[in-house]
Amino acid sequence: MNYLLWISYKGTRYAGFQVQPNAPTVCAVLQDAMQAVFGCRPDVKGCSRTDAGVHARRFALSFCYTGKVPMQKIVPALNAHLPPDIRALEILPVAENFHARYAAHAKTYRYYILNARVDDPFTYDTCHRVGAALNLAAMQAAAAQFIGTHDFSALCASGSSAAAHGDTVRTITNCTVVQNGDLFTISVTADGYLYNMVRILAGTLVDAGLGKRTPESIPALLESGDRRRAGPTLPAKGLFLEKVDYPGLDDV
């Protein structure tokens, strides 16, 4: 039986989702829990390769399991063996050929920025602090310029395999910035992402909020394909994978 499992995790202690040698990862810890519950280590297919320090509110993964543990007991059983910074949320059966990464037609990320002079001791590891005042209207106007189908080479870190193969065109369907007190939230929904794309996009929006660039400069930035003309890559700690959309499963 092929299953789709939704999990949530705080990525602070982990070197990303994918299993890596000599480094703690979310997938490795999850497979340890599966070993304890199932007596085996299923091949886990994640929806994304989140980097070290990145968090996820609803991360999707698929795996095959044909053992005796009934589906309705899997989530509580896994949680009994998982650390508190990783939680299993929901599970459902899916088609045998379902792959959590390739079946996704959109993912939503959010980047959280604390606009304050000092860090908040309760959120310092889940948001990035900017001390100087940010102009919300400028950030919103700049965000709107990213919506659409573009070559996002300028928002791609070096070393990207997609960039090496010229596969840098993506479609952003939503890009917004909202403010709630000192907290700025950047939300991006797209059909796919390049390496560090959201963190570079967020850094570019911060530049706009600080008056270092105008919203009207964004189209020329994208047209240039030059990473050096975009903003800085903001720290991983402010980035969350919020949602993964699958055809026919969007209400799950």
Over which residues does each language-model region extend?
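Structured-RNA-binding interfaces characteristic of tRNA pseudouridine synthases
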Residues: 1-252
